[in-house]
Amino acid sequence: KGLNLLLNEQHDKAIDSFIEAVQQDPDTSDLHFALGNLFRRRGEYERAVRVHEHLLKRADLPASERERAQHALAQDFMKAGLFDRAEEAFKALDGTVFDTEARLALLALHERSRDWRAAVEVAARLERSGSGSFATRIANYWCELALEADARQQTTEADAALQRAREAAPQAPRPLIMAGQRARARSDHREALQQWGTLMAAHPSAFNLVAVDYADSAKTIGEGPAALERLEALYRRGPTTD
């Protein structure tokens, strides 16, 4: 009956029919999941949520099926753009077979909302669990926190955040770029040259982003000719600067 209703586009009646079937026979939960997933694919997120929330309300649902329903519900919210509800739903999957997938989804949500501290925490947990290397991403999150602190004129906090970025990924280019930029902004051109010199050696292509500032800082402190020699040597190794 439920399939006939579905085929006839009577979706609400089809849901009721499937719900009744699931209540009468727990073995039909796979059909319930299939229906919910179908609605999600069709963009009918409210219906998908209804299906999966009903499953979660069932006291007799096995733990593995409950986790599956929670995961499906989190996906419903994510697809529907209900990000706060998606975050809570994914958090409920902590310690389940969907743990890693849920954390990756949470990381994407935190990046989207620019909640960098939460992103640091989730990425660190992913790395500790052996889900891959997140060092560069963690460094980028700390760099974002440093930028926000600078915007609030909280220099000490910005310094600390940038230091955390460098600790997370010592050879990542962005912390070196920012360290040089911040030094130049406070007219500490020698420190800027030191930071960018490290960048030049480790990431010649990224150095291209600050090559002009590097030359200007060198000229400011009377080291223009030496800087020009280094830039020419870098160019001879590979044309990465303009």
Residue ranges and their predicted role:
Residues 1-27, 41-44, 75-79, 144-152:
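Alpha-helical segment of the N-proximal tetratricopeptide repeat
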Residues 26, 60, 64, 97-98, ...:
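Short coil turns that delineate tetratricopeptide repeat
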Residues 1, 35, 73, 106, ...:
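Structural register within alpha-helical repeat arrays
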Residues 30, 64-68, 101, 136-140, ...:
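Start-of-helix register in tetratricopeptide repeats
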Residues 49-57, 83-94, 118-129, 154-166, ...:
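Alpha-helical repeat scaffolds
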Residues 36-85:
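Structured, soluble extracytoplasmic/luminal domains of envelope-associated proteins
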